[in-house]
């Protein structure tokens, strides 16, 4: 896959979701660069990865290709608590959640960092069987179940491309409720009457 493929895969999930995004497992940044391209010059992206060298490479590439994008790199394990300010408009997990046994726990753990109405975009191999290089992939059907379990809404397939490795790669988008209630309904408060 090249840059145009990365952009095309996530485009429909990213557009209209705001400009402040958190990315889990950014690596050298193939999808981070696609995100910057889609969000435009006012974008703010926080890229998390355990590999300091990959993040340094990402920062250098971002500076050359998308110098107006505000990129913050954080060396951390995204499966643990992330000490950062909440209020992100979107979360991107592109080919990263297949490295953790329980992707639902990871997503559930980062949801407090997202604003009400935010978007979650996942890119993953469309398979429920892994191998040594991709130990815990999950199909789109499995992602739908995970998303529902953690309270995400309107999960939809936004892109899919064939892959020589595990058949296909898909992108899915889900939304966070626009209110504090998990089903998206506003909490009703009664004020005592006399």
Language-model segments: what does each one mean?
Residues 1-19, 34:
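Conserved alpha-helix/loop element of class I SAM-dependent methyltransferases that forms part
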Residues 22, 28, 32-80:
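Class I SAM-dependent methyltransferase SAM/SAH-binding core
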Residues 79-91:
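A short acidic, Gly/Pro-enriched loop at the edge of an enzyme's catalytic core
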Residues 117-125:
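Conserved beta-strand signature within the Rossmann-like core of class I S-adenosyl-L-methionine
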Residues 136-150:
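Short alpha-helix
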Residues 151, 159-194:
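Core SAM-dependent methyltransferase catalytic element
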């Amino acid at each position: 896959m090249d840059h145009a493929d990365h952009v095309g895969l996530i485009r429909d999930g990213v557009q209209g979701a705001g400009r402040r995004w958190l990315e889990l497992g950014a690596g050298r940044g193939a999808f981070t660069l696609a995100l910057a391209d889609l969000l435009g010059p006012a974008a703010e992206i926080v890229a998390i990865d355990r590999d300091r060298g990959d993040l340094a490479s990402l920062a250098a590439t971002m500076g050359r290709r998308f110098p107006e994008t505000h990129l913050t790199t954080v060396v951390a394990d995204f499966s643990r608590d992330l000490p950062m300010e909440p209020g992100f408009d979107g979360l991107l997990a592109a080919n990263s959640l297949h490295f953790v046994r329980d992707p639902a726990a990871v997503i559930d753990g980062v949801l407090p960092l997202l604003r009400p109405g935010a978007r979650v975009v996942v890119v993953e191999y469309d398979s429920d069987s892994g191998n040594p290089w991709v130990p815990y992939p999950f199909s789109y059907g499995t992602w739908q179940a995970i998303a529902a379990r953690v309270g995400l809404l309107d999960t939809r397939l936004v892109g899919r491309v064939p892959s020589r490795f595990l058949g296909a790669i898909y992108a899915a988008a889900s939304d966070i409720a626009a209110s504090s209630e998990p089903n998206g309904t506003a909490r009703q408060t009664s004020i005592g009457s006399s």
